[in-house]
């Protein structure tokens, strides 16, 4: 069987203009940057399984959710993926991303910082805090990942 992939603990790295940090267990902790739309069509295949991402804490109803959305050129690999409730990923979070994309398309400067909140040693966040700054105006939104 394939060795389970994991990220380094307490690490900081950049991909596609975004900065990511991991916590003391190697879980995705923050993802942030100034949003930009990717310059190519289509989506890259996600190579990591939901089990690679959730380390056994994922639910059967979870999607492999991007922290920074694919449309914003968010990485399509382990460092940008979390077990995300499919209802949240395909509805509330997608609507949030749609609004941010409209702001980017309108030429506004949109900064997004996401912080994942994990219960105990779980690799599945139970909440995601999103801090958006659009042309200097900051808003905070919390998404529950039930």
Predicted regions and their residues:
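Domain-level detector of nuclease and nuclease-like folds
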Residues: 12-146
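Single conserved hydrophobic/aromatic residue that forms the stacking wall/gate
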Residues: 1-9
């Amino acid at each position: 069987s394939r060795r389970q992939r994991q990220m380094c603990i307490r690490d900081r790295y950049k991909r596609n203009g975004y900065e990511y940090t991991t916590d003391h267990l190697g879980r995705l902790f923050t993802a942030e940057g100034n949003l930009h739309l990717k310059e190519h069509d289509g989506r890259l295949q996600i190579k990591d399984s939901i089990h690679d991402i959730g380390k056994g804490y994922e639910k059967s109803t979870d999607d492999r959710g991007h922290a920074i959305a694919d449309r914003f050129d968010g990485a399509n690999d382990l460092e940008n993926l979390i077990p995300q409730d499919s209802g949240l990923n395909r509805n509330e979070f997608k609507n949030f991303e749609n609004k941010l994309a409209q702001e980017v398309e309108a030429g506004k400067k949109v900064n997004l910082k996401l912080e994942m909140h994990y219960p105990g040693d779980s690799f599945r966040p139970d909440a995601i805090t999103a801090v958006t700054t659009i042309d200097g105006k900051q808003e905070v939104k919390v998404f529950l990942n039930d």
